[in-house]
C-alpha cells in the first residue's frame, strides 16, 4: 500500500537496519573466522586420511605378498614330501 505521498510503506524493522548492519559485520567476521578454523581442521583431517589410505594400501599389498608366499609354500610342501 502506498502512503499519502505515493511512497511505499516503510517496513517495520527499517528503523533498526543500521544497528543490524554493524552487528551483521561482526557476526560475519566471527562466522568467517569459524569457517577458516573448520577449513583448517578439514585440511588436517584430509592429510591424515590420505596418510592412512597410503598405509592401508601398503598393508594390503604386504598381506597379498604374504598370502602368496604361504600358498606357494603349501603348494611346494606336499611335492617335497613325496619321493
Curated annotation (Swiss-Prot):
One GO BP annotation of this record: bone development
Family: Belongs to the UPF0184 (EST00098) family.
Localization: Cell junction; Cytoplasm, Cytoskeleton
Chain's gene name: Bbln
Annotated Pfam families: UPF0184
Domain of life: Eukaryota
Region (Disordered) residue spans: 1-25
Name assigned to this protein: Bublin coiled-coil protein
Native source organism of the sequence: Mus musculus (Mouse)
Keywords: Cell junction, Coiled coil, Cytoplasm, Cytoskeleton, Phosphoprotein
Amino acid at each position: 500500500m502506498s502512503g499519502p505521498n505515493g511512497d511505499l510503506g516503510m517496513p517495520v524493522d527499517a528503523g533498526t537496519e543500521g544497528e543490524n548492519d554493524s552487528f551483521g559485520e561482526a557476526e560475519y567476521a566471527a562466522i568467517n573466522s569459524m569457517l577458516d578454523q573448520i577449513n583448517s581442521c578439514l585440511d588436517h583431517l584430509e592429510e591424515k586420511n590420505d596418510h592412512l589410505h597410503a598405509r592401508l594400501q601398503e598393508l594390503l599389498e604386504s598381506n597379498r605378498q604374504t598370502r602368496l608366499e604361504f600358498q606357494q609354500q603349501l603348494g611346494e610342501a606336499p611335492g617335497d614330501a613325496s619321493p
